[in-house]
Amino acid sequence: MNDGPLSNLVKHSTLFCLTVMLAGCFSDGPGDLFYDYQTKIARVQDADEIKEELEFESLPRKRELLLDVPSLSIGLIDSYQLRQCGLFNLIAERNSVLGKVADEFRNYDYQVALLAGVGRCLSGSELDPEVVELLREIEQQKLAQFPRHQWNLIYASDAMQSQMRGSQWLHADIGDQVRQTSDALEHINRALNVPLVSGKTTEVQEVLEKSSTLGDLYYSLTRASAELDTITKQLTTFDDNIICGKQRDTTKFRYINNVFEQQYIGKVQPYMAQLDGYYQQLAPQLGMFDAQPDLHSYYFPIKDAHHAFRSSTRRHVDYWQQLFKRCGRKVGR
């Protein structure tokens, strides 16, 4: 049997506090796809629409995610020796008024530059022993603190908070936006994994701050899963209303088959495939959001949302396959 679009589709805690009626009204196109789909199914079933509530938990605010990093007092010791290896000006800039109010992106770039500078100084042979000892101590302390600076860059920076705090459906015409976000996240990943040879994180800060691609994708995946689960429940709850078989009135089956073709195959499935495509494009960069329980209990659960999205799709497709088998329709016919 040729499973056609059904098999092809299968092959292929949330960002803001809000309670929505899953079968209710929506403010934009993608949400209407699911609403229309369920409405037409319920009409054919001659049944009430099942309504489910879904509560989205907000992305924690910056103050809830910011990890404290004890400051190290680095005095301008032996300024001549530090100048020789390029560390003096860096420390002086950090100790300035502007340096003390740097955001998480600039702070991360400073921490990377400081470690690189300390390494250069230690590789020289003209430092006094007491300076070498102090720099080695600073290096050890900074390396121990580095994971906390990385965490703060990902979760407590204004740019990444903006990027992850989504509240609307993604549309199917934002390919350029997704590519820009993917490129920016790739840059951040390099800065996290090979910081001493990567470019500054501030190079992509504006791109990340001016969109909420990740947040809106997370919202869309989560919302689509919930909508589809509600529609699957609608179908299974009133499955007995769809009569088929020899010498039976199969009018409702013909009608619901039309709903499947026109609404699901024609509209919902293409949108779901687009969401999945956006996720796959960003997926190589999402490792930075894996859980880090040693640092914090929170993690950005976009991978979980995509797993639930795939599972919801599989359950929905399973229902239609079972219905078509019961009623003798060959998929793709």
Predicted region positions:
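Bacterial N-terminal signal peptides that target proteins for export
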Residues: 2-14
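C-terminal motif of bacterial Sec signal peptides marking the signal peptidase cleavage site
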Residues: 21-24
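Sequence contexts marking disulfide-bonded cysteines in secreted/extracellular proteins
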Residues: 26, 84-86, 122, 243-245, ...
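Eukaryotic low-complexity, intrinsically disordered regulatory segments enriched in serine, proline
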Residues: 26-30, 55-66, 206-213, 264, ...
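N-terminal Sec/ER secretory leader and immediately downstream segment
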Residues: 28-171
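Extended amphipathic alpha-helical interaction segments
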Residues: 139-285
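Hydrophilic extracytoplasmic domains
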Residues: 273-333
